[in-house]
């Protein structure tokens, strides 16, 4: 039975992604309420996962979970369930009990969560076959804890299982080194410029010179680009917050040439809904696909400084590079940098500069080279 449970989960993924069934699930909840029972009485495991993922907490639709966030939630929760099933013997999970209750989630006990916790810390599912990074553990723990707490609040499970899941606090030393200097950025850009690879060059230049998130660039349309003494690009960031990115004259020309080579003219038109950054098929780039492509672009340069880095240079690394260059080359203050990057909290902006500033302010750099 426990094996068919996993198969059923895999088959039902399209259902979990579709928000059309919210009303039907809530009708079942209403029936239970009218009978004086808890809301989740008549729901199955999959339905409670569905309701948790699609739960609307705000009357303003823009403030509720976005599609990508929902996908991430579904993926993590299903991984949690599949882990429980695949390691049932190790976790001492009783398959007969699961069948009797027709529910995995209602069968879970505190010791199952503690064993899952130990497994999560040791499993080699991370980058390069290593254990998960602390930041990844923190993300998984926060999400599963939130889900288990939700099940307890809605009385689907009796025990507060979320209290058994250990926290994974991310300290400064746990964060990957995403610093990238001006010289390193120029070496990467120079590699593709010298080889005349305009598309790769334009994408990397766009990331480095605007500080944009890759998803922001992938969703921009021609109508979002306008000229007001300088070129400005309107992007929609996290939380649907809109801000403008400065586009240099040189970057604008590169974007125009990239579009021209792919069969598109660039006329600033507020009614043009077509993508600004067009892929080979003339469509919007998929942000995850492009993000992977950017990582590959960097690897293929085989630049010497990349061999000594602990972590690969990714699209996100260029946001850190932008922050460092803004402070080093442009003397930007923290508040203006926060606004430009679209950070909600200035602490996030500080994290971007943390390692760089500690190295820059290390007093040893002022005299140690003289000790020869």
Descriptions of predicted regions:
Residues 50-69, 75-175:
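N-terminal core-binding DNA-recognition domain of tyrosine recombinases/integrases
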Residues 249-308:
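Active-site/catalytic core of tyrosine-dependent DNA strand-transfer enzymes
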Residues 118, 172-198, 220:
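Long, amphipathic, Lys/Arg-enriched alpha-helical "connector/arm" segment
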